[in-house]
């Protein structure tokens, strides 16, 4: 009798645990947070060598870290966008070290996505001082730590703001605001696709966060600008938030922008042109936001591959320079509901390789595959061997040799393969 009672009790506990687990998994939680990562005025801007590391003169609009956390009870991820030229992997690792214990998000579930604005803060590049001094000014460890700590603050703030949410994902096209900028191939491909993640509050039914994913260099503002700015990205966020209304936070993730520039629009100055590009992008995102239908729950899968790389000298990086013997980084992918895949590229993927990765995602059964550029690192340009051989501008700042582009593409294919939708067998 005692054995039977023990067996029944064990069965009851097992069923209860399964029920509780299923219940926990059926509740989707989300949170948003942001922080100001604008360094002190006088800090050099990062992006244009023509500035010659001169000190910044002011703040036009704050550069920010904006974090979105999604937790389905099984996987908890943070997507944090920073208005910056590009955080390197060491910075990302420190952000994770600060934010992970405070949020209980696994370190490799924190994704730091640099917008690549050329009007963000400098003085942060520790490796390759010759390049660092030209692009971002003299290294200052206190400024670097400032960026890291402020970005972690955004993630921690989002974690304190968790609520029940629903999620919707979709895509549209922002035509005419980007162009192929490289010299090879002639009339190279442009990807106008806009990916959108919308997160709604269950309580209010209104959006609390919109993530837009679009490929273009935030370089509407030229080297003559000496004030901090998010470039067209800031205008896009502001316009989208006004269009939606309420207490919504818009955030931006760049795509495969390695060979893509914004198309110049009419305007009296760079600010008007930035506003024009940002407003057009926001209008397309708004269309998608209004069209997509939210779900109460989303399945989340992740895949990660650590990479050990070796720098290959170029005309910009001659053999006389001192290089680290190896460089550690990573490449990642996320899938939602076996329908939408996001490949997190640790650098500036070229447009040709972008289409190769997206086509492979479609072949593997994903409804849409998106690229999160400059995510968790900023490795420079990632282009095809053909582009490298034609000595394009991008090839001069392609750090890991002519075969690096195909290597990254193949690693992306393998990540997508690991996450590919499983076909349900009919009985």
Model-derived segments and their meaning:
Residues 25-113, 117-249, 253-276, 289, ...:
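Conserved beta-alpha junction segments in alpha/beta enzyme cores
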Residues 281:
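Anionic-ligand-binding alpha/beta catalytic cores of soluble enzymes and soluble regulatory domains
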């Amino acid at each position: 009798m005692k054995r039977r009672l023990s067996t029944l009790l064990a069965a009851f506990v097992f069923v209860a645990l399964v029920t509780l687990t299923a219940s926990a998994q059926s509740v989707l939680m989300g949170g948003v947070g942001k922080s100001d990562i604008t360094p002190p005025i006088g800090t050099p801007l990062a992006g244009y060598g023509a500035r010659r590391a001169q000190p910044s003169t002011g703040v036009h609009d704050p550069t920010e870290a904006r974090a979105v956390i999604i937790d389905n009870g099984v996987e908890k991820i943070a997507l944090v966008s920073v208005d910056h030229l590009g955080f390197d992997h060491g910075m990302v690792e420190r952000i994770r070290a600060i934010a992970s214990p405070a949020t209980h998000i696994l370190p490799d579930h924190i994704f730091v996505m640099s917008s690549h604005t050329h009007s963000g803060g400098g003085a942060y590049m520790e490796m390759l001082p010759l390049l660092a001094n030209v692009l971002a000014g003299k290294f200052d460890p206190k400024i670097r730590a400032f960026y890291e700590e402020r970005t972690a603050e955004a993630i921690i703030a989002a974690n304190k703001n968790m609520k029940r949410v629903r999620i919707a994902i979709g895509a549209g096209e922002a035509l005419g605001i980007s162009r192929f900028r490289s010299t090879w191939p002639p009339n190279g491909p442009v990807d106008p696709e806009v990916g959108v993640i919308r997160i709604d509050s269950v309580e209010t039914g209104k959006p609390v966060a919109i993530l837009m994913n679009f490929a273009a260099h935030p370089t509407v503002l030229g080297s003559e600008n000496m004030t901090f700015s998010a470039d067209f990205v800031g205008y896009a966020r502001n316009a989208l938030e006004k269009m939606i209304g309420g207490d919504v936070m818009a955030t931006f993730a760049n795509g495969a922008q390695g060979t893509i520039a914004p198309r110049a629009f009419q305007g009296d100055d760079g600010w008007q042109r930035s506003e024009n590009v940002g407003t057009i992008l926001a209008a397309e995102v708004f269309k998608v936001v209004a069209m997509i239908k939210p779900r109460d729950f989303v399945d989340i899968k992740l895949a990660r591959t650590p990479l050990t790389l070796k720098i290959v000298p170029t005309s910009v990086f001659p053999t006389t320079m001192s290089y680290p013997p190896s460089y550690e980084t990573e490449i990642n992918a996320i899938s939602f509901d076996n329908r939408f895949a996001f490949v997190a590229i640790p650098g500036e993927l070229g447009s040709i390789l972008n289409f190769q990765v997206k086509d492979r995602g479609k072949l593997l059964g994903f409804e849409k595959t998106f690229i999160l550029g400059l995510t968790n690192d900023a490795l420079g340009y990632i282009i095809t061997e053909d582009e490298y051989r034609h000595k394009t501008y991008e090839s001069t700042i392609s750090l890991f040799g002519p075969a690096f582009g195909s290597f990254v593409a193949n690693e992306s294919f393998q990540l997508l393969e690991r996450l590919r939708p499983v076909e349900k067998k009919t009985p």
